[in-house]
Amino acid sequence: MDAGHIPVLLHECIENLNIRPDGIYVDGTLGMGGHSEQIAGRLTTGTLIGIDRDETAIARAGARLAPFGDRVQLVHGNFRDTAAILDRLGIGAVDGMLFDLGVSSPQLDETQRGFSYMHDAPLDMRMDATSGLSAWNVVNEWPEGELKRILYEYGEERYAPRIAGAIVRARAQQPIATTLELVDVIRSAMPGAALREKQHPAKRSFQAIRIAVNDELAAVREMMDTAPDKLRVGGRLCVISFHSLEDRIVKTGIARREHGCTCPREAPVCTCGFVQTLRSVSRKPILPSEEELECNPRARSAKLRVAERV
């Protein structure tokens, strides 16, 4: 298999899901179906629900998972809506959930999707090609202040003001239509020292724009707010993140559900209504092994957090 399509932290996810042959499991970010294939292969009378916002991913994974027959159900949808999707399917509770966040390797590798700053393509970056907002809209239509905000908040780009200003000046001459046109604009805004750094100068900006186009951070928050409620007691939640913004949301979401009642100790009765619903299986995130990194360098920034329903 192409290294770009190797499922990240596969062994660790399967081990921590504690898969039961008769259980119900959710892969909320189906992608190429690598994680799902391993889950479905461990089911006898159980069911796997695979969700992805990318119709191309649904089609490809569907072919890969076809041998499992009706043990697998695939849904075109956003992982942020996992709880609602399960309700729609008439599924009250599940035994495990897996979410592999961020852009998938096939999306990066398919030049025309516009995710990569290494190849020329139309400015798109939509994970769901049926959605309206594209990178072209963000780059060419959003106000300078909003561009500066997303570059700083989502890309943690220290040159956000300079890059936002350069984008606005460039698009005033003519629309920025392709990925490499945008890369040129970003390069023009950065000082020489930044251009000599090991990291590609457009990496942070492309991340920021992609997150904005796909509303990725809000999606993670909504998932963490609602999806764990669909776990049975003892069911496991596995979330793989690839940058600190996602990981912070996941970590905070688990911690909030671990603490339970927030009322003062002296309060005679609980009035906040919060109860503990999760416990962390490991306090620190699980990281890829050196062996995995040798086979799949794209796994380098991956972090897996695991929690159990209580």
Could you tell me what each predicted segment is?
Residues 1-310:
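S-adenosyl-L-methionine-dependent methyltransferase catalytic core, i.e., the SAM/SAH-binding region
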